[in-house]
Amino acid sequence: MAKVNLEQIEHAVRLILEAIGDDPNREGVLDTPRRVAKMYAEVFSGMHEDPKEHLHKVFGEDHEELVLVKDIPFYSMCEHHLVPFYGVAHVAYIPRGGKVTGLSKLARTVDTIARRPQLQERITSTVADSIMEVLEPHGVMVVVEAEHMCMTMRGVKKPGAKTVTTAVRGVLENDAAARSEILSFIKSK
């Protein structure tokens, strides 16, 4: 996949400024095309990374019980409106065969997947599927909570409304008690 074309983004932003009736040569917005291009390169940096690469660093640890990293902050851009949504991800897995990854690797996986034009549902599923594929755990559960600016500042205009999505894989799919335990850990402070 090609890297971000900063010049093309700058040109497009100038066209947008003109299309909304602003003067792209006005002092206040003169550098806006460059700033937006740099921002897009940053917020869409996940387009050029494989999130699974983070998970390949494993430690041989004889632990086959729950590992949960909760309240992982993330931001993304809604692929429908190109406006932000942001929130927290909670990632739980039950290791198998001594394959335990670094805790920061779970957060990096979330970030890489979120830093593309996205849907919250896809972030949730892709995080779970990536962990299942690379770590081959007994089970995975991912819960994502987010506020979407496309619902806050346009359309229905409901600030504060949160969307919650889940993805459950492996043994956790049929174990309601384990899912409840994970949810209780997520809710605890």
Curated annotation (Swiss-Prot):
The keyword Iron does not apply. PROSITE patterns: GTP_CYCLOHYDROL_1_1 (PS00859), GTP_CYCLOHYDROL_1_2 (PS00860). GO terms for molecular function: GTP binding; GTP cyclohydrolase I activity; zinc ion binding. Keywords: GTP-binding, Hydrolase, Metal-binding, Nucleotide-binding, One-carbon metabolism, Zinc. Pathway: Cofactor biosynthesis; 7,8-dihydroneopterin triphosphate biosynthesis; 7,8-dihydroneopterin triphosphate from GTP: step 1/1. GO terms for cellular component: cytoplasm. CDD domains: GTP_cyclohydro1 (cd00642). The keyword Metal-binding applies. Zn(2+) binds at residues 78, 81, 150. GO terms for biological process: one-carbon metabolic process; tetrahydrobiopterin biosynthetic process; tetrahydrofolate biosynthetic process. It catalyses: GTP + H2O = 7,8-dihydroneopterin 3'-triphosphate + formate + H(+). It comes from the Bacteria. It holds the Pfam family GTP_cyclohydroI. Its EC number is 3.5.4.16. Gene3D superfamilies: 1.10.286.10, 3.30.1130.10. Belongs to the GTP cyclohydrolase I family. PANTHER family: GTP CYCLOHYDROLASE 1, GTP CYCLOHYDROLASE I. NCBIfam families: folE (TIGR00063), PRK09347.1-2 (NF006825), PRK09347.1-3 (NF006826). Homomer. This is GTP cyclohydrolase 1. It comes from Bacillus cytotoxicus (strain DSM 22905 / CIP 110041 / 391-98 / NVH 391-98). The gene is folE.
